[in-house]
Amino acid sequence: YINAIYPDVGVASYKLLKSLGVDVDYPLDQTCCGQPMANAGFEDEASKLALRFDDLFKQYDYIVGPSGSCVAFVKLNHPGILAKEGHQCESAGKIYDLCAFIHDVIKPEKLKARFPHKVSIHNSCHGVRELMLSAPSELNIPYFNKLRDLLQLVEGIEIFEPSHVDECCGFGGMFAVEEQAVSVCMGRDKIRHHMETGAEYITG
């Protein structure tokens, strides 16, 4: 996904981790984790990709990805998929979303960064509800937000969060394809809520 659509995100993630002193490797022969196939009902085909993923990354101490959706699929679904193949999943316990890895593993006390702008935080559904990057509003638990914690280490930044703070933006992977009209309406609402904060940028 990152390779094909947003390669600049992959490059930026690599550079960020290197700047934080992490020994980073990037296996050039990695492929998709299998989520699109599994979501479309082809779990048998997805199992081949899950097995390849697990074998490729078993040599590493940590696995870090910038896509919360992909990370959540590996963490939560690969163990069950691979168990049907008689394979013990090794990746699920050591894969992290980029934000969670920096927040929970590296735990920086400061960042060499300055960004004097107003920024609104987008709390993605997979990040919130599957990776617990922030407190899901429906759980009625004390609020926390790992991305906000990290952004507060950036000099000059002003941080905002929209109303309906963790309401779905309408993307949802295949939902955006299968229910395009509904997805667009939800996306417009989410953008409006972000714009109402007065932010110059949106990040997630």
Where are the regions a protein language model picked out?
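Iron-sulfur cluster-binding electron-transfer modules in prokaryotic oxidoreductases
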Residues: Y1-G204
